[in-house]
Every structure is written in C-alpha cells, then in structure tokens.
C-alpha cells in the first residue's frame, strides 16, 4: 500500500451510532481494504466531540487514486451515500497520504485491535532528517508489527505521521515506551517544532479484499 485515504468524521450530538453504521456500509461498498476506528483516547479533550477515522487503502500509485476519485465523482449513488453521512456530521475531512516505510508485514494470526497515530512536525529544513531518523527507529522497535511512517499530501510540509498497531492496550503501551526511549536516544525532539501529538482508536470494522 503506497497511498491511502483517511476520512475523519465528527458526528453531530446523538448521531454517533448512525454514523458508525453508515461508514461501515460505505467501506464495504468500496471493494478496497480498509478499517474504521473509534477513539478511546484523543489528543485534545476540549475539541467538539469525538471523531471516527476510516481508511481506504490498497492504492499502489496516484493513478489508482485518480481512477477511484473519478469513478466516485461520476457515480450519483456514491455521492448520495457520502452526502448522507456528511449530513450526520459536524465536520468531515479527507486526507490523502503516502506510505513512506513500505508494506506493513503482519505475522499469521495477528489482528490489529488498536491503532495509534502520532504526528511529528519537523523544524524548517529538518524534514528529511526527521524522516530518516523515524525510519531508522522503526527498524529498531521491538514490536509484533512495525509501525507505518507516512506523510499527508496536503497541510504542513514538515508533518510526518507514525501509525502503530497492536492487539491489546498493554501491547500498545509497551510499544510506546520502547519507541519513546529509542526516539529520545536518536535525538528526535531536537528536530521538532513542538511535542508530538497522539490519538488512540479501537478498530470497530475492517475490510479485507
């Protein structure tokens, strides 16, 4: 998976269950691999409501993304389905990202039940150094599944995301402590404009094709 799209939706008050059900159906209809997470720990508890994050993946290049978008915009049924979900939400955002760390290899029988997303914002001129350091630390982390390093195609130029998967909260926490120690030793904090921020979500739906 070289490229993937995240859909971040914040339901209107009382509409969470409807949004969850609608997003699950929408994911199933894409015919692409993906998942849906519900937050269990958010980076900013004062924000308006919680957000559900869905992912559509399996794009090997940007031409495949173009093809999917063109077919989506030309399909009235798809547009109606997305509009009906948006009508239940306070806010909706789409984020196209590039996977910078290669395929995510999972051992047989592994199932990701939790996903954490940590964002690092590089100082001006330090993005390449930050990326190289994160990729190096990724290889040294003692986890069942290596995290994925990615970048959004829009937004702040120095922003890099590290996505970690685990089967349990304890496993996720053990991986976090291991990663923090190795990141500190590698001098990552010296390359950042601010402290990293992190969210944790539970996988409530997955699509495998």
Give, region by region, the residue ranges found by the protein language model:
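Short S/T/G/P-rich N-terminal loop/turn motif that feeds into the first structured element of a domain
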Residues: 1-209
């Amino acid at each position: 998976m070289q490229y993937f799209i995240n859909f971040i939706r914040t339901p209107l008050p009382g509409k969470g269950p409807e949004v969850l059900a609608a997003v699950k159906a929408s994911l199933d209809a894409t015919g692409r691999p993906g998942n849906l997470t519900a937050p269990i720990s958010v980076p900013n508890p004062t924000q308006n409501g919680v957000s559900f994050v869905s992912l559509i993946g399996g794009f090997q290049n940007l031409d495949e993304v173009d093809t999917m978008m063109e077919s989506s915009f030309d399909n009235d049924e798809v547009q109606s389905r997305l509009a009906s979900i948006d009508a239940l939400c306070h806010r909706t955002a789409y984020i196209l990202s590039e996977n910078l760390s290669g395929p995510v290899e999972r051992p047989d029988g592994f199932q990701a039940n939790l996903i954490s997303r940590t964002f690092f914002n590089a100082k001006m001129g330090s993005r390449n150094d930050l990326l190289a350091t994160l990729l190096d630390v990724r290889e040294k982390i003692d986890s069942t599944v290596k995290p994925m390093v990615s970048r959004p195609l829009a937004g702040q130029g120095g922003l890099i995301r590290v996505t970690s998967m685990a089967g349990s909260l304890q496993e996720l926490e053990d991986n976090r402590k291991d990663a923090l120690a190795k990141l500190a030793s590698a001098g990552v904090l010296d390359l950042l404009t601010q402290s990293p921020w992190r969210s944790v979500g539970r996988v409530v739906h997955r699509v495998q094709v």
